[in-house]
C-alpha cells in the first residue's frame, strides 16, 4: 500500500496514436477530475509530440544552435585561438545537438538536419583545428556507443532485443521492421550500422 497523491492540475496525458484516422480516447480521471490531454510534452529537456515527429525538439535545438553560433563568431572576430574556439564548440554547440540525439536524431526531418549541419559547417570554417563530423555521423556514433553498452549489460531492457547470428556470433541479426519511423529509430539504426566503417 502506498500513499502517493497526484496533483491533477500538474499532471498531463499524452496519447501516442499513429493511425491516420483520429480516434477518440477516454480521458484519464483521477478522483473526480479529468487529466488534461496535451499534444506535446517536455521531459528532461526533450520535447516530444503525440506523433513522434520531433519537430518541436529539432526547432528548439536549431534555435539554440544559432544563438551559440553568434557567440562563436564574436570570439572568432576577436582573434581567439582556434584551440579555444574548438573548446567552445564542444562545450556550447556540440553538446546541444548531441543531447539525447539517440532519441530524436534518427527521425529528424531532412530540413532540420540540414540546418544543424549548416551550423556545424559554419563552425568548421572558423575553428580549422580538425574536421567536424556531420550531424548524421554524430548520431550514428552515439548509437554505436549505446549499442555496445547495452550488449555488455544483460540487465538492460533492450539486451534481449539484440540477436546474434547463429553463423557468426560477431554479427547481429537485422530487426524486422514495419514502419519508417521504427527503421530510423535508435536500435534498428545501431544494428544496421554496427559493421559499417566509420566515416566523417
Regions found by a protein language model. Give the residues of each.
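Structured, non-transmembrane catalytic/binding cores
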Residues: 12-17, 22, 60-64, 113-121
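Short linear motifs embedded in intrinsically disordered, charge-biased segments
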Residues: 107-200
Amino acid at each position: 500500500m502506498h500513499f502517493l497523491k497526484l496533483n491533477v492540475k500538474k499532471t498531463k496525458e499524452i496519447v501516442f496514436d499513429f493511425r491516420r484516422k483520429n480516434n477518440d480516447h477516454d480521458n484519464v480521471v483521477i478522483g473526480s477530475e479529468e487529466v488534461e490531454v496535451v499534444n506535446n510534452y517536455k521531459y528532461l529537456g526533450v520535447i516530444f509530440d503525440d506523433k513522434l515527429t520531433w519537430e518541436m525538439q529539432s526547432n528548439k535545438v536549431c534555435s539554440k544552435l544559432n544563438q551559440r553560433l553568434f557567440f562563436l563568431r564574436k570570439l572568432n572576430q576577436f582573434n581567439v585561438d582556434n584551440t579555444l574556439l574548438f573548446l567552445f564548440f564542444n562545450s556550447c554547440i556540440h553538446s546541444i545537438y548531441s543531447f539525447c540525439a539517440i532519441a530524436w536524431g534518427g527521425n529528424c526531418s531532412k530540413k532540420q538536419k540540414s540546418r544543424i549541419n549548416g551550423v556545424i559547417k559554419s563552425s568548421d570554417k572558423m575553428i580549422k583545428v580538425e574536421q567536424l563530423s556531420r550531424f548524421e555521423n554524430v548520431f550514428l556514433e552515439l548509437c554505436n556507443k549505446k549499442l555496445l553498452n547495452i550488449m555488455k549489460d544483460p540487465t538492460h531492457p533492450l539486451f534481449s532485443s539484440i540477436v546474434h547470428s547463429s553463423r557468426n556470433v560477431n554479427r547481429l541479426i537485422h530487426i524486422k521492421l514495419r514502419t519508417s519511423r521504427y527503421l530510423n529509430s535508435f536500435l534498428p539504426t545501431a544494428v544496421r550500422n554496427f559493421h559499417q566503417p566509420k566515416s566523417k
